[in-house]
């Protein structure tokens, strides 16, 4: 198996997933590509139900049992402790093999809701040690010492004492720190954070993001953020994938997405971000709601909500047009024959402001 | 925790006392009495009443009864078994019912758990459907119908087990009634276990455990079952009481001298035997309250959220 990029650590190629439900088949993921390079942070942004989480769950074998992978590859550059290196397709691995070789040791996850993601009947110490004891030859005392170390690393005071706490004795922020400690316990290469701060209050959010960033630079982790919060994306991401109805509609580095967005959906997302300087007294929201993928619409799935939709949008799904080496967007507006469309003036003013502000900090 | 236990035990005893009082008064004001009027003259009845102390005020009678009860003396029957001490009669009945009921609980819980776990681990597949159908049948078919079915096939067609209960071949002759009694528990436990497990398997914390590389039996034992079993204890408790206190019809059909049969005799015999009704009522209530107490305490052991107070340092 070959990877396209030699620096890449994870590559998702043409991933296509259907969910079988009582109501029929839902084509949730429609040919997703995604690249992650070592040490980078990549964000996947989109509304609820756009398939952000499903994509990453499929990549780690945590897909719900009614999900079927129709095609695609999830290539992972698996570096073992002995220095050997092998590119594996995670979709070809059995669940058991994934759990044994990949989950925890190479790819770890932080989930959205810290209130429900820890086992309520187990002390947090054993929860951190569990994976270590299973995977490594560490003795119980060594694993314990390492767990205390990890708790200190994620900023839990009184770590020694907290080892014996049950999840319900900790606050939400503390629990999320414990979840992060668990994720780090296997020394992973990739950390997938599925809306890690959505369930936390704002002050804690910032602290958790700082923590993840700090740990990332210390341990050389590659991080994938799944989020609907563009504020989080701006703080942490190197690259951004904008996802809509199971497709990635725009991808670029963080500057390209925030200052030169090309896809009308990205425009909508950016306009819908609350901003102190906006003169409008109403917050913009993208009209309509995401399509029901039970009945896949022909053409561009975003067309019905898109004020800039062209006639062709109703007939054919746009391919990804290249804007720069790192920036691509799937909208017919980028076709050479498409009419030239100006950004909505409010958004234009806003992007201008953001750019100026960014320059001030440089 | 100690304080909590003491409080719960105290409350349980108080509850029991109230129940005894209510029962005591109820049997006396309800229609029916220990004396078959067609065979006894008014004078005989009056003598008998005086002998049993039934002519005294109710509160005095209650006081007398309680003083004896606290010494472990249930008194004698007012009409049943020619006034043999209730304790002796009850001992045999309890031992029969408890042994058959206990066996039924063991079979029901063990097989029920096994079925439930199998169904949950094979969610949506054939085994899951099979277990669902089985549990529905088990809940719907009364145990005595199942007993008759078993008697027909395993005593008559293939004569393996005896037709009736035989105290001399205790273990062997309790198999059929135990199995038929266990069916309801089995089905309830199976269905509940399956649903609880499925819910836990979809929980975030099981996802997290999987994402750190836990799989297979360790995942099921340590994370799924441990959490799924907590609510199962609650459904199990009343089922256990039901089984221990005997099954009226099954005991009747299979000729078992158990508590269920005794209760029927005490009410529908020659006359209503006050003391038997009371003794059995106390036994039922005490068992129920006792098992509920055990379940509450067990909850504390199983669920740290109850045992360890929030944020407790």
Report the location of each language-model feature.
Chain B
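N-terminal signal-anchor/signal peptide hydrophobic helix marking the start
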Residues: 6-16
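An internal, D/E-rich "acidic patch" concept
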Residues: 55-113
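Hydrophobic alpha-helical transmembrane segments of membrane transport/permease proteins
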Residues: 16-63, 158-176
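Short amphipathic alpha-helical coupling elements at transmembrane boundaries
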Residues: 47-50, 64, 68, 88, ...
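Membrane-interfacial helix-loop-helix junctions in multi-pass membrane proteins
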Residues: 50-57, 73-83, 167-170, 265-275
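Membrane-water interface segments at the C-terminal ends of transmembrane alpha-helices
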Residues: 23-29, 65-67, 133-162, 180-184
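Transmembrane alpha-helical core residues of multi-pass small-molecule transporters
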Residues: 11, 19, 107-108, 135-138, ...
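Alpha-helical transmembrane segments of integral membrane proteins
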Residues: 2-3, 94-127, 143, 168-313
